[in-house]
């Protein structure tokens, strides 16, 4: 799934199909809330029947220090997908982008995979609120860079 999000031609085609077929009022860029993490070089994959799985969950302040050293990465694939969509749809159909909330993405980073109770994330929030805040700020910066693309 992430591979198709990171392929500009494929993402643009998937984005434009509903507009062509159903004449909807707007197009939503085909993506996933994990794409900003993938662009930043974080080991993340979507496992069928499970959802997002992180190669290295962020559990400690030193883990937060390590991951927050990464920058937003190369967003040219997202920029190209958006350019292709706009070229096809013109200025009459708005293109909408989206990103995951910093809390949601941070919880995935700490848990390492989907969780119903978020025990590890809640533990970090209470035991090390500064590390949690740094992680959320980093994710917010990733989201901002992604949405700007």
Say what each PLM segment does.
Residues 45-149:
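Active-site-proximal, glycine-rich beta->alpha crossover segments in alpha/beta enzymes
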């Amino acid at each position: 799934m992430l591979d198709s999000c990171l392929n500009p031609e494929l993402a643009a085609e998937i984005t434009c199909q509903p507009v062509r077929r159903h004449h909807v009022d707007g197009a939503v860029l085909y993506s996933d809330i994990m794409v900003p993490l993938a662009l930043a070089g974080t080991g993340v994959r979507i496992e069928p029947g499970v959802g997002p799985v992180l190669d290295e969950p962020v559990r400690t302040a030193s883990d937060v220090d390590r991951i927050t050293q990464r920058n937003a990465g190369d967003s040219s694939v997202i920029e190209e997908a958006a350019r292709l969509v706009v070229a096809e749809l013109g200025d009459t159909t708005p293109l909408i982008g989206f990103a995951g909330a910093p809390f949601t993405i941070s919880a995935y980073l700490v848990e390492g995979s989907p969780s119903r109770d978020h025990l590890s994330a809640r533990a970090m929030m209470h035991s090390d609120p500064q590390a949690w805040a740094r992680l959320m700020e980093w994710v917010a910066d990733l989201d901002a860079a992604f949405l700007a693309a």
